[in-house]
């Protein structure tokens, strides 16, 4: 599935509430359509943030969770990396800012405020330690590995650092390492 404003989704404005609604719908669909014995989640970057927020609010419906380069400090990433001073000024004046990589979408001040209010770094995920694996590239240019190290340590989560991998794991050897570790973790 695609998160709101990602992939084939047609929503023009990004909200965290929509992410929660979409993930709930996907889980309900999977349960009704396939009646799986177990459900695993594999998310990258924002997908990692969104599932962590979901787990904090609803508990974990997953037997295993694998996160690659999770954006655990998303508010900081938006304000320090994605948004320009011009974007931040627009948001302060109540206007939308347009963000995104391949696909552009709108955010408003409420979205940025909701990121600050939902600071994943402040939540306790230690209850999920046995069912969660984080993998992160040591050369990630988008989500600082230091933030993820602090998050993993605080919550006693397993973190595998993939030497030389960037945020997108563009190197096929690094991606292969990630895929193999993911499969091993989910099926162990």
Tell what function each PLM region has.
Residues 61-150, 154-161, 166-185:
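The alpha/beta-hydrolase serine catalytic core
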Residues 1-10:
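Conserved alpha/beta-hydrolase
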